[in-house]
């Protein structure tokens, strides 16, 4: 994917300000909302099952993140994902720490029934879904990109989703086109809690304005990586890197 495509997608986000429904975890809400606002999108943290499905009909994209799952939140995710699926709207599955507990894996299995447009996770999370084997240290990955590339390709073919594996290097595959390997940004970015969750939200914004899910996902990863690199040049540590990334996304 060219830099021109990434710039075009980012410009479209700014022009159209897509409404992105984020059913995400307590830890990530603030950062995800600020990243979306900075990029030019409109975040909505609507998760209650009494309205999540109805609201999804209004949104340009839905993002379902299982970081802090509970029965009602999972019901809200399922309702929103079902609405998005039936309406042909894009939605992103972020399977946070899916290998940590059987409840998380069961939740992901339930959500996969609604055919996510994109699955974005770290190497361990993607490996768990692809191979049905537990792995990872909670939200952290103990697998490498080399461990997961073939499994990510197979998962993309099997699920019909674009699969994005993020880490020191990012990997994007739809199981058909040549996979993309992109730089992961500043090496301190993993020290910022919930930045990956915010990246999934940014992916939702890009999907809402660009029909090619493979290109939209790659554009989101490129935007975050570039913002991280620019922010890292002036950041003293993860705290300043966090707010500088938001500033860079707003430029």
Put a short name on every predicted segment:
Residues 1-43:
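Glycine-rich phosphate/adenosyl-contacting loop at the front of the ribokinase-like
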Residues 40, 87-88, 160:
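Glycine-centered short loops/turns at secondary-structure junctions
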Residues 65, 73-122:
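Glycine/small-residue-rich loop that forms an oxyanion/phosphate-binding "nest" at active or ligand-binding sites
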Residues 103-179:
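Conserved phosphate/ATP/ADP-binding segment of small-molecule kinases
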Residues 128, 191-222:
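Short, small-residue alpha-helix embedded
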Residues 151-156, 213-228, 246:
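Short, well-structured alpha-helical segments that form the helix of a local strand-helix-strand
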Residues 180-193:
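Short pre-catalytic strand/loop immediately N-terminal to key active-site residues, enriched for Gly-Thr
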Residues 225-251:
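Charged C-terminal helix
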